[in-house]
Amino acid sequence: MHNSPLYAAIDLGSNSFHMLVVREVAGALRTVTKVKRKVRLAAGLDPEFRLSRAAMERGWDCLRLFSEQLQDIPADNIRVVGTATLRLATNVDEFLSEAERVLNHSIEIISGEEEAKTIYEGVSWTSAGEGNRLVIDIGGASTELVIGEHSEAKLLNSLHMGCVTWLNNHFGDGELSEARFAQAIAAAKAVLEKVAEDYCVLGWRTCVGASGTVQALQEIMLAQGKSERVTLPKLQELMGQAIACGRLDRLQLEGLAAERLTVFPSGLAILIAIFETLNIESMTLAGGALREGLIYGLLGNNHDCDARDRTADSLISCYQLDKEHAERVRDTAIEAFNQLQPAWRLSKRYGRPILRYAALLHEIGLCIEYKKAPQHAAYIIDNIDMPGFTPAQKKLLSALLFNQRDEFKLETLEKQGAVTGRQAIRLARILRISLILCMRRTQGTVPNFTLQAEEEALTLTLPKGWMDEHYLRASELRLEVERQQKMGWPTRLLEA
């Protein structure tokens, strides 16, 4: 089989240099290589904005590592960009001359506006969302704020504050105190003050974070047993934990990786300032940002499709699933959801989309074998890259697939963080019934049905005489009723 070409994006950031190498497979991107090295370029800027020789050497050493990977990739498939620190450096030409020689490739220093726009493109390709979306990316020397809808950025700014510069300015001696955090937050608010009104007037429906700070926050919250959604109270709690440590060299937070320790307090202070200034309710982690935006720019793909739809379509293609049958199960499950939504108060925003994808991907485990297909399906979802899905959404999807037939495994449904455990169980009950109704795998064979619920009691009503004419499905439905009743959920099967 002929392999599709490789594409590479390199981001010369103010804190770290990143390289992403991908291949396009079945309409989706497959990561081949990811390399990150902490260079702390911004820490090498003096008061006259000259990069120190040591900082430049750190950058060149990193690019020597990257250069080997680029040798077999066509030049037209590579994009290398520099961001905030290289925009500021007065001796940037000295750095670029050697950097381009090492890489054997040109380097673009992109404007703050272009950086913000490219970040938004990466987010729109890799993160799902409807309506206006606020994107926050806290870099080493700049912070990008973008509001957009679908693939269009409507309002964007690149602000002169970042986790490395705020580290130097406010936590340079390593002290972690209430006063230092207050100082750092106030300074960030002063920067935000100039643009805040524009963002509040335009408004947004969802907020996503695309930086290492937000990645670190999510890792901490999951390690500490919290949901993945970032809120101001959670940020303030983490600030309290950091202050309790007293000093940067004593900072220890459960879930915080050692490589993120140094710039975490400064990034946290900036994020608290953003939350308080813009009155943000909650935020989740974006699936991608600048590097992904650069890659999709090289590919020139259109943005008309939801990120999760692209991922599902790619998996259906890669695993050779029966798409016609999958869509039939999807339509049946969504009809069942819509009937039960008022009584069960099911989440249209968080529950319905994941039920939809569970229906579309329910046969993915068959690529391994039939008997344990639900477990195999859950394993695949747990361990595959799924652009557009947050970690909690992946866990819910995995739990639904794990519970699509046979005995219920409640712990998987209760441990995911996308919806409540009770809602997850109800979604699983809907999926299981929908799969049985679609067993014939033929268009026009799904019966008309009515689902009614009162608390956990569930009644499925089918056309009169249907069960006598469809013995196998009737038998499977009776077995399913027994399973659900065994769990303590009153379930009835009627004809009318």
From Swiss-Prot:
Catalyzed chemical reaction(s): guanosine 3'-diphosphate 5'-triphosphate + H2O = guanosine 3',5'-bis(diphosphate) + phosphate + H(+)
Gene3D superfamilies reported in the protein's UniProt record: 3.30.420.40, Exopolyphosphatase. Domain 2, Hypothetical protein af1432
Pfam family, one: Ppx-GppA_III
Alphabetic keyword roster: Hydrolase
The protein's Enzyme Commission number: 3.6.1.40
Annotated GO biological process: guanosine pentaphosphate catabolic process; guanosine tetraphosphate biosynthetic process; nucleobase-containing small molecule interconversion
Pathway noted in the entry: Purine metabolism; ppGpp biosynthesis; ppGpp from GTP: step 2/2
Species for this entry: Aeromonas salmonicida (strain A449)
Protein name: Guanosine-5'-triphosphate,3'-diphosphate pyrophosphatase
